């Protein structure tokens, strides 16, 4: 958690404005949910590793009976949201009758995770999500990717990648290699480390986990085959015949081709069979923004068709994309980014002992300029007026 100084706040406000305006142009509607959710909603085995990072809120008043508590559930009833997806699903379930279908939601707000702080990652951070609920076709993925990449492009980023994969491909690869279905999650957790430990490291960890060497070798050979193939997706579709539904290849190719044909930003769509995404609620397509400047993901998302049904008892197709807002801000700050001048900025420096009647004239003039659309600052003149003027000039004031 950190304090935000004026210089950074100005950039954050600008970025939020660009995000909101762009997403609204794609038909997304802003909504807001509380920062706290019922602990049962947050700890339902849908949030993956994030469920271990919940800031939990103790019961209060008469409900808090410490002496009688036998487990954590007797002490805790709420938690700070760790993402915006779980609250959105609860929101949709409660208000579905009053919402259009499909529903295109835009959310921007703080989330909290009791994580180890690192570069571009904090315990309290802003998330910017767009989701489409009620659209079963891949039109949802296409719209989400185009809206997000258009936004990233407007912020000045180029030559980034959208890595894309499918949960059904991950499962088919594991089944083809001989892993039992109950072991898939463990296999995927290890595979998710590929960027950090490499193929040899993944193979070693799988063997250390006790899996058969034959299965591990067969599994790793698939990734080598993708690497050497002219078209990795088509290679897997052929190799995994009988394990992978035919529609999966067609679905991904439609998404990739449609986005490539319509994109306005400078980026590439890349099929990546090592992409896992940590959330267990994903059911189909998954995708991630890869920034060369950061050397890490800068946002991601995917399809979660089974999650709404956990609240309503009836599955509703859903898909979402989240921008890594804090990492975007970090990159802009480090690059020396300055907010484009949106309106003129004028500063009036008032000397000590300035006559009251003349001060009134200055205030009146300032008000007139504000009415005309200018940003006007009225401040007392410092002793070191040269330094003061230099600082104001650096901030864009005239």
Regions found by a protein language model. Name each.
Residues 29-35:
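A short beta-strand-loop structural module common to alpha/beta enzyme folds
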Residues 50-66, 178-202, 291:
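Acidic, His- and aromatic-enriched active-site or binding-groove loops in soluble protein domains
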Residues 159-169, 187, 270-274:
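Short, surface-exposed recognition loops or helix-turn segments adjacent to catalytic cores
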Residues 8-26, 37-38, 72-75, 83-97, ...:
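Positively charged, Gly/Ser-enriched RNA/tRNA-binding surfaces
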Residues 45-49, 176-178, 285, 392-394:
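Short low-complexity, flexible loop/linker segments enriched in glycine and/or proline
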Residues 1-12, 66:
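Auxiliary tRNA-acceptor-end handling modules of aminoacyl-tRNA synthetases
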Residues 39-40, 168-169, 190, 385-386:
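Short secondary-structure capping/turn micro-motifs that flank functional sites
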């Amino acid at each position: 958690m950190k304090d935000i100084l004026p210089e950074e706040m100005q950039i954050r406000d600008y970025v939020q404005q660009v995000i909101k305006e762009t997403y609204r142009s794609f038909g997304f509607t802003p909504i807001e949910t509380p920062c706290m959710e019922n602990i049962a909603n947050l700890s339902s085995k849908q949030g993956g590793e994030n469920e271990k990072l919940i800031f939990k809120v103790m019961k209060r008043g008469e409900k808090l009976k410490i002496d009688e508590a036998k487990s954590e559930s007797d002490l805790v009833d709420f938690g700070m949201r760790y993402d915006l997806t779980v609250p959105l699903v609860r929101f949709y379930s409660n208000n579905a009758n009053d919402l259009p279908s499909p529903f295109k939601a835009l959310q921007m707000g703080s989330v909290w995770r009791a994580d180890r702080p690192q570069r571009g990652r904090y315990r309290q951070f802003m998330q910017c999500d767009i989701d489409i609920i009620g659209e079963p076709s891949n039109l949802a993925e296409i719209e989400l990717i185009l809206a997000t990449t258009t936004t990233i492009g407007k912020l000045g980023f180029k030559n980034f990648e959208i890595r894309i994969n499918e949960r059904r491909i991950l499962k088919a690869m594991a089944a083809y290699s001989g892993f039992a279905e109950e072991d898939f999650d463990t296999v995927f957790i290890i595979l998710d480390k590929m960027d950090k430990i490499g193929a040899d490291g993944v193979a070693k960890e799988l063997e250390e986990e006790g899996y058969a060497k034959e299965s591990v070798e067969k599994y790793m050979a698939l990734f080598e085959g993708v690497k050497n193939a002219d078209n990795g997706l088509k290679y897997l579709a052929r190799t995994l015949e009988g394990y992978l539904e035919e529609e999966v290849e067609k679905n991904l190719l439609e998404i990739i081709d449609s986005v490539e044909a319509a994109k306005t930003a400078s980026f590439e769509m890349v099929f990546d069979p090592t992409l896992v995404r940590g959330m267990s609620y994903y059911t189909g397509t998954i995708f991630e923004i890869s920034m060369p400047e950061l050397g890490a993901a800068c946002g991601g998302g995917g399809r979660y068709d089974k999650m709404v049904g956990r609240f309503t008892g009836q599955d509703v197709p859903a898909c979402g994309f989240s921008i890594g807002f804090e990492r975007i801000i970090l990159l802009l700050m480090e690059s020396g980014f300055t907010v484009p001048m949106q309106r003129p900025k004028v500063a009036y420096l008032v000397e000590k002992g300035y006559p009251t009647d003349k001060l009134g004239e200055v205030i009146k003039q300032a008000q007139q300029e504000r009415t005309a659309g200018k940003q006007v600052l009225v401040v007392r003149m410092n002793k070191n007026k040269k330094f003061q003027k230099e600082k104001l000039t650096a901030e864009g004031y005239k």
